[in-house]
């Protein structure tokens, strides 16, 4: 092979490699965003944590789908009192797991996942339209860099307890659910204590564990661009769903698939 033939062959080879790499990258972005650099460990335990304006039953569409795959599933009843107490409730459940465990959080409970996710049993983290602060970060200050979501105006307090109004819950929290379903969820929402919102994480488990994120593009409770920022910062494998804040209820198949991916 002469020099000209070698150069042509070499350049064609590079071009083929570049095209192949680009195709893989596009497929990855289309299905799961930027892949985490950390390897995924096979897990048989799933621990789910609910956020504000909800209780453990908010995972009821996802739980049977995970159980059908033979996974051991526990939904934590988040006390919604203070961040340390909420984290302790989660840790007690994690202590009971018998091996690698995927820790999943929705909404506010991303704070809990971020803090408790350093537990040795936790093999991967999944954030569902969830907060994902860095260690010691003021999440409120971070959120103020983005437009104020409409649901914020619907928070009302009875003394120390906060909840969403019916209008805000149906329109801004669970906007893509049938009205009857949204009203049933509104009826069982757990009130939260003001002190819960003042807590800061001391850990950032997503810096140590493989992380996955489901962005809700129609979210009116957490700004979707803030969700994208947090997902990108943690180098999470990311999906985007045309969903309200409660994608775990309106898109349970996609959320289940993301958790299964995290479980290896």
Give residue spans per PLM region.
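C-terminal segment of N-terminal export signals and the immediately downstream linker at the start
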Residues: 1, 20-42
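Active-site loop/oxyanion-hole signature of alpha/beta-hydrolase fold enzymes
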Residues: 67, 72-102, 116-119, 139-144
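Post-His helix in hydrolase/transferase enzymes
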Residues: 249-261
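Conserved HGGG/HGGXW glycine-rich cap/lid loop of the alpha/beta-hydrolase fold
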Residues: 43-83
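Flexible "cap/lid" loop of the alpha/beta hydrolase fold
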Residues: 122, 126-159, 193
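Conserved serine/cysteine hydrolase catalytic core
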Residues: 193-234, 239-243, 248
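N-terminal export signals
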Residues: 5-26
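Gly/Ala-rich beta-loop-alpha elbow adjacent to hydrolase catalytic centers
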Residues: 105, 109, 113
